[in-house]
Amino acid sequence: MNLKNRHFLKLLDFTPEEITAYLDLAAELKAAKKAGREIQRMKGKNIALIFEKTSTRTRCAFEVAARDQGAGVTYLEPSASQIGHKESIKDTARVLGRMYDAIEYRGFGQETVEELAKYAGVPVFNGLTNEFHPTQMLADALTMREHSGKPLNQTAFAYVGDARYNMGNSLLILGAKLGMDVRIGAPQSLWPSEGIIAAAHAAAKETGAKITLTENAHEAVKNVDFIHTDVWVSMGEPKEVWQERIDLLKDYRVTPELMAASGNPQVKFMHCLPAFHNRETKVGEWIYETFGLNGVEVTEEVFESPASIVFDQAENRMHTIKAVMVAALGD
């Protein structure tokens, strides 16, 4: 399995065997770190981290993973990057490609990370775009593998909520690529695009995956092993949009009742974070005062329950990102 010098832009670019190879390497690197016997395989490498969108988990995961492996990083924050403003993506790619061994990009359009990859001459890693979140998918798959006690191709999961963007798109493709039973529970207006659904069905034909899209949240979660969700509204969207989205998605909120509707007493809750699950943030308090909701996409009761594995999931961002970098750059 040769993943050397490979870009990591979206799961559609990889075979099921290649995705599994990343997961196996991540598990191996995680075990080595826990045992204190990690071997540095990226000594002398330098990685540029371009962030057009702010981040906690993605930035920390890339920085810690790189340093664990002996590599250096340069963080280009949103205000410092000239990409697309004073300098074209093509020129930025060619400059950074001369100085760095790899480039991570977290930002808006998928076309930006694809163009970086086209011109950089070094591996480019997608830390998140509007369309895809592939490093999160490796973390999610590793977490499900650790917690399900059975092979991924015998595992079922649901994503409930707004499924139009990177998490809904990516989870649908992940499940299809790995032969899983994947369900999307959302109003039809918030389903992934027809192109993404078609790509998932094409992958499922190869892997035997089962794909379900439904407007019924209870139907989506029936007999699943994992229930995923994500935030319903992005910060900066007007209050009217929040109200409209909350009204549209109220039946898709992850509550103890929805967890119980799975019929699986061992069902686990997953979220890529950050989550609006209580009033302990300025945003959470504003949501409570404005809409009367204590927690939005998930209740505090579920988020803090033993069923919640969100912090295992967050930790696995680092191990899986490390696997992507080691596979591409490691000695």
From Swiss-Prot:
Subcellular location: Cytoplasm
EC number from the UniProt entry: 2.1.3.3
Reaction(s) catalysed by this chain's protein: carbamoyl phosphate + L-ornithine = L-citrulline + phosphate + H(+)
Protein residues bound to L-ornithine: 166, 230, 234-235
Molecular-function GO term, any one: amino acid binding
Major localisation: cytoplasm
Any one GO cellular component localisation term in the record: cytoplasm
Residues at which carbamoyl phosphate binds: 55-58, 82, 106, 133-136, 272-273, 317
Protein name stated in the entry: Ornithine carbamoyltransferase
High-level lineage: Bacteria, Pseudomonadati, Pseudomonadota, Betaproteobacteria, Neisseriales
